[in-house]
Amino acid sequence: MVTGGNQVMETRRTAFPTLQQGDDRVQTGIPSLDKLIEGGLVRGDTTIVAGQPGTGKTTLGLQFLVHGAVKCGENGVYASVIESGEKLKRNARRFGWDLDVLEKEGRLQLVSLQSTMKAGVSTALETVLEALHTVKARRLVFDSLSALMTAFESTAEARSFLHIMLKFLEAANCTTLMISEVPWGKQQLGTSFEEFLGDGLIVLESSFDNSRVRRRIYIPKMRGTENRLEGYDYYITREGFALAPTPIPPDKIR
C-alpha cells in the first residue's frame, strides 16, 4: 500500500516560486498542433497523451521539453518509469536533439524511476519533485501513468494519490504531459478514470491502411479550448512530429 503522499506533497509545495495563473498558452513545439489548440496548452494544465506502443508518445514528450528549453526559456524534466536516461538520449539524437547539452546547461533533467519505484511510489514522486525544484522546471513529462498505476492496490488509492500530485503541479504552475499506454486492440485508456484525470486529452492512434501504417491524432478534450472532433494524420519525421494539414471528417473516421 502507498502511504505518505500528503506529506510528500506538502513538504515540497513551498519549494517552487509561483507564477500568476492565467490563460496564457504553452507551445508544444509542434506548430501544426498548436494551431489546433488555440496556440498551445494552457499554462499549468496537465494533459494526458494516450496511445498504443509505437505511436510516438515519447517523441512528442521530448519535443515538448526540448522546444521549451531551447525556444521558450522554460526548463523541463522527463521522468520515466520505463525508459533509462541513456535510451532517451539515444532516441532524441535521431531528431537532432542533444539532451546531454541541455542537461549540462541545467535546462533539462532526465529522471529514471526504474529503481526508485522499488522503494515505493512516494519515494519516486519525491525524486520527481526534487528534480523539478533543481532545474526550476516549468514543464514535466511523466512516463508513464500506466506504469504508475500498477504500484497501487486499488483504483481508489491511485485516484487519491494522483489528485494530490496534480494539485501540487497546478500550484507550481508546471505544464505537464502524462503519457498513458493503450494496449493493442483497445480503443480506451488503461483505467476508467485516466481520461478524466487531466485538463486535456490527446489520443494517438496507429492502424494499417493499404499495407502501410497510418497514424492519427485526436484531441477529444482540452480545457478552455474549442473541441475538435476531427482526426488528423500525423507523421514522425527527422525533425519530430508533423501533422497533415487536412483534417479527417468525423464521418470518415472508423
Regions picked out by a protein language model, each given a short descriptive name:
Residues I82-E86, Q114-K118, S146-A147, T176, ...:
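Conserved nucleotide-binding/hydrolysis micro-motifs of P-loop NTPases
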